[in-house]
Curated annotation (Swiss-Prot):
Catalytic activity from the UniProt record: ATP + H2O + a folded polypeptide = ADP + phosphate + an unfolded polypeptide
Name of this protein: Chaperonin GroEL
NCBIfam families: GroEL (TIGR02348), PRK00013.1 (NF000592), PRK12849.1 (NF009487), PRK12850.1 (NF009488), PRK12851.1 (NF009489)
Source species, domain of life: Bacteria
One GO cellular component term: cytoplasm
Stated family: Belongs to the chaperonin (HSP60) family.
Gene: groEL
Length: 547
């Protein structure tokens, strides 16, 4: 086991604080409408330019191991805020730095760290309740646009795109961000249910100019097994041909003779048919087939429940107004499924989302909800260079998470005003069990001014003057650093999602409290490199001296 280096008391805290400040100082320059960029060196390729707090925090690793422990703990604040709300990482870092700095001053002055922590925790609980009280619902498209604009660093085009996307696919819909091909941002909306499986043979294509298969009012057969024998599906093909409608086959796979026969029948015009593989794998495939069945009022033909493909009838087939199949995707538009059954299925999947502990599973379940309920929107980010594209994608991603958070828990005045107002209200009534808890409460409430002060500092103004003016005001009155004007923050469109502000405060206070109560730090001693004796002698010089 490696030898350890141990530091106690003030020595440990001073080192830890230095690491906290290095990381937080790098992150906080990005805060606000006039925040600056940070350039991150990469081992390969061009450097990355970002204004995303968590991206900056993740890059920082310090040489001194004690300082690095402090930096890593603040990095955890940014990561947790990012995981919970997808935004507010810089605010969380600024709050953590302010609480740690104020708290360690009090500890150095002889205060009891545990009582200070209890005071900080009480202040945070009270302020969170106050934030919930001043929060208002985010319902209109205009408010969603404003939240998106602020989170994308005052980029109005991003705010507008997100608002349009939410309008098209609903607040529960899936909105994804992808690289665009041009200089401008674009929004693509996929209506109906789309899954990532394309046609099994290019011979099914009936729109050669677009390279797609389009079926109008088709029957849809859903099969939970491989089809390799054409005799299995022949009765269904004959019934569909008599009905004079096209057929879409969705199966685990269609192989050999069966696929060849389908292609020949399509090319001869005997029956209009297309085949695709079922989406997903294993249990997820079964669930998605059932989703399609409910959407199209069909039945999944599965041997597990004693059904045979040869005996399938038209009543067991689903139907839709239109199906479009490309090389990579299949889209089912306007399935004839019963609205009540679709809603029940959506409710069932939402319950699974609540019960799930895996982020990956939650994401996949959320996609299924969107496909059943509303559709999918894709924001394509345009930029002149790859570096600019990456930076913009980060901002769009932040804005997207912020708007979701705003829809979920509402909005509060932005620009750090909500925390200042909530802290002022709490300061008038909240007291601790002893004097040291009162100090903890006061230092936490004082630290809540830090985001406002940092936004103002980054805008090149005097933080103390602006903070005093804002505190003298009431309600939504605050300072717009973008225009350098005072006024009603909500009317000026400066909004923050309540969830983002709340999460930032809770995670910052939680980890700052742990750091304030730290008394000992332990790390590995650096290993001393032992010199190889032969290397030290410089080798034998090729034994040239022996000749």
């Amino acid at each position: 086991m490696a030898a350890k280096d141990v530091k106690f008391g003030n020595d440990a805290r001073v080192k830890m604080l230095k690491g906290v400040n290095v990381l937080a100082d790098a992150v906080k320059v990005t805060l606000g409408p006039k925040g600056r960029n940070v350039v991150l060196d990469k081992a390969y390729g061009a450097p990355t330019i970002t204004k995303d707090g968590v991206s900056v925090a993740r890059e920082i690793e310090l040489e001194d191991k004690f300082e690095n422990m402090g930096a890593q703990m603040v990095k955890e604040v940014a990561s947790k805020a990012n995981d919970a709300a997808g935004d507010g990482t810089t605010t969380a870092t600024v709050l953590a730095q302010a609480i740690v700095n104020e708290g360690l001053k009090a500890v150095a002055a002889g205060m009891n760290p545990m009582d200070l922590k209890r005071g900080i925790d009480k202040a945070v609980v009270a302020v969170v309740e106050e934030l919930k009280a001043i929060s208002k619902p985010c319902e209109t498209s205009k408010e969603i646009e404003q939240v998106g604009t602020i989170s994308a660093n005052s980029d109005e085009t991003v705010g507008k795109l997100i608002a349009q996307a939410m309008e098209k696919v609903g607040k529960e819909g899936v909105i994804t961000v992808e690289d665009g091909t041009g200089l401008d941002d674009a929004l693509d909306v996929v209506e109906g249910m789309q899954f990532d499986r394309g046609y099994l043979s290019p011979y099914f294509i009936n729109k050669p100019e677009a390279g797609t298969v389009e079926l109008e009012n088709p029957y849809i057969i859903l099969v939970d097994k491989k089809i390799s024998n054409i005799r299995e599906i022949l009765p269904v093909l004959e019934a569909v041909a008599k009905a004079g409608k096209p057929l879409l086959i969705v199966a685990e796979d269609i192989e050999g003779e069966a696929l060849a026969t389908l292609v020949v029948n399509t090319m001869r015009g005997i029956v209009k048919v297309a085949a695709v593989k079922a989406p997903g794998f294993g249990d997820r495939r079964k669930a998605m087939l059932q989703d399609i069945a409910i959407l199209t009022a069909g039945t999944v033909i599965s041997e597990e429940i004693g059904m045979e493909l040869e005996k399938a009838t038209l009543e067991e087939l689903g139907q839709a107004k239109r199906v479009v199949i490309t090389k990579d995707n299949t889209t089912i538009i306007d399935g004839i499924g019963d609205e009540a059954q679709i809603k029940a299925r959506v409710a069932q999947i939402r319950q699974q989302i609540e019960d799930s502990t895996s982020d990956y599973d939650k994401e996949k379940l959320q996609e299924r909800v969107a496909k059943l309920a509303c559709g999918v929107a894709v924001i394509k980010v345009g930029a002149a260079t790859e570096v600019a594209m990456k930076e913009k994608k980060d901002r769009v991603d932040d804005a997207l998470h912020a708007t979701r958070a705003a829809v979920e828990e509402g909005i509060v005045p932005g620009g750090g005003v909500a925390l200042v107002r909530a802290a002022s209200k709490v300061a008038a009534t909240l007291t601790g069990d002893n004097e040291e808890q009162n100090v903890g409460i006061k230092l936490a409430l004082r630290a809540m001014e830090a985001p406002l002060r940092q936004i103002v500092t980054n805008a090149g103004e005097e933080a103390s003057v602006v903070a005093r003016n804002v505190k003298d005001g009431n309600g939504n009155y605050g300072y717009n650093a973008g225009t350098e004007q005072y006024g009603d923050m909500l009317e000026m469109g400066i909004l923050d999602p309540t969830k983002v502000t709340r999460s930032a405060l809770q995670f910052a206070a939680s980890i700052a409290g742990l750091m304030i109560t730290t008394e000992c730090m332990i790390t590995d001693l650096p290993k001393e490199e032992k010199l190889d004796p032969a290397a030290a002698m410089g080798g034998m010089g090729g034994m040239g001296g022996m000749i």
